[in-house]
Amino acid sequence: ASGKFGITSGVTLDGTVNPDFSQVESDQFHITVNQRFPLFFSEKRPFFMEGMGLFNIARGNNMRTAVHTRRIVDPIFGAKLTGTVGKTTFGVLNSLDDHPGDIGDRGDEFADFNKLFTVGRATYALRRSDYIGGIVTQTSHKGRNNFAAGGDFIVRPSSAQSVAGMFLTTRTNDGSNDTQGNAAQLTYEFETRRFQSTVQAEHYDPDFQMDTAFYFRTGFTGAWTYQQVNFYPRSGQNFWLQRVSPFVFAKIGHDRIQDGDENFLNTGLRFNFTRQGNFNIETSRGKEAWLGQEFNVGSDIFLFAGMQAVRWLNFFGGAGIGPSIYYDEVDPFQGRQLFSFFGFTLQPNQHLTQNFEGNVSRFDRESTGERIYDVAVLNSKTTYQFDKHFLVRFQAQYDSSEHRVLTDLLASYEFVPGTVFHAGYGSLYERGFSDGLPDDAIRPAHIEQKYRAMNRGLFFKASYLKRF
């Protein structure tokens, strides 16, 4: 059961007990082979999506968000208090997770205990859209406690300039170890019709740990800058070439965990056309540290293009080739990677929408030319909107590295906003042998692996909104 109560005209309390927090749409497949950093999956559950913009802190690069509610896997209850009083906007989120994943390699048995999440956030409005803010988070999980606190700000000295910064400190105790770490980031931006400039510096201690957040790594200090100049070939909206923008991106840093320096230089040209068209041509080169070694990274050439070709068709695509790293934990090596991606949105009428995306990645060992992997991921989504209430959606996804296909069929009827009924059916297929023997068992040559259904599911989900 869920409810919403307006305490005052500006303060609202949302609560839920034993909710069905299952998603009605599967996460999109991504290439997972040879990824150094974790993949980010956005929140799709309504309770956590509503009003969560408040909990974001100022313009981080390494930290995607300070409160990533996908960390709360299976909530027993949730409560959220949000509101505005004068110039102060605040929010408090509290939830108990029934099946959390353990952090700190303490063992799978800890995953059976509940984990309590508590987040407090407040911002104070200054002039225009400037603000100063603070955040406090606390998680408790079977003897392990993680605490984080800090502040952030955004100020705009002029219409073309902005300065943003944040500082966080964390402390983690699991009964045997007590660790503490800090993180800080400062960003300056300048943007006019002619020039665009960004400079950012950030630092993360090796022992920085914020359980509620999503960030890529810790234990590094780095700085980067992006500079772009815009040229407008001809005034007016009818000329096909709207803007030409040469740009350069440069980054330096030191990774204390991987024990090495890093640098990266990317430069190129960006063209903007009518019909939301754009074309990029870039080249980049850099060094990246991994397990005490420094490897070459970058792209000899990278191309990207996209356009709203006609009213009912939008497409995009890109490709690049260059040096890369095979991120093996024992024996990493230098390689070369060829990658490409493409997609389109087709909407021939007001009812039908077809989305398609594809990603392909190939990696070869540089010293021998040996092919290490060749991966393709395809995602297709077809939606038919019969009217403003009723839709049917079919989603199919394919991952060649995992040899699996996922299909989802969903029918959804929304009576009024907040009152909706879902019915869905999903299947997961994986390629393998159907004789029951291990995959590496010796078999006759004519026996081939086939895709077989590993999981099927049928679900019904309804929500009802009652206003008092």
Language-model segments: residues:
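Outer-membrane beta-barrel channel domains
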Residues: A1-Q242, K251, D255, T283-E288, ...
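Exposed, low-structure sequence patches enriched in small/polar residues
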Residues: D74, L168-N173, N177-F468
